[in-house]
Amino acid sequence: MGRFGMSPGPNVAITYCRLCNWLLRAAWMGQELLSTFAEELGSVTLIPDDTGGVFEVRIDGRLIWSRKEHGRFPEIKELKQIVRDEIAPRRDLGHVDHKEH
């Protein structure tokens, strides 16, 4: 059970290449998601993997970002928007949602 007797929110799992030393990147992205979605998320899990170049983000087991598929890491702004669209679609992310000029 989560806070106030409610069920815990969704889990975000970040699988990262241990051999590539991407722990800090994964941890930073996890911290950003926890800070932004403190009320909505149940947990963020970091999963080290020895698969070369792997960097994947999943919500409750469903893949939402793959470095292999996209050919790059997500920008934190776009990752927050993807997570928001999945767990709190009506939520305004403030400056993250505003277009740059």
Language-model-detected regions and their locations in the chain:
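Domain-level signature for proteins that mediate thiol-based redox and metal-cofactor handling
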Residues: 1-101
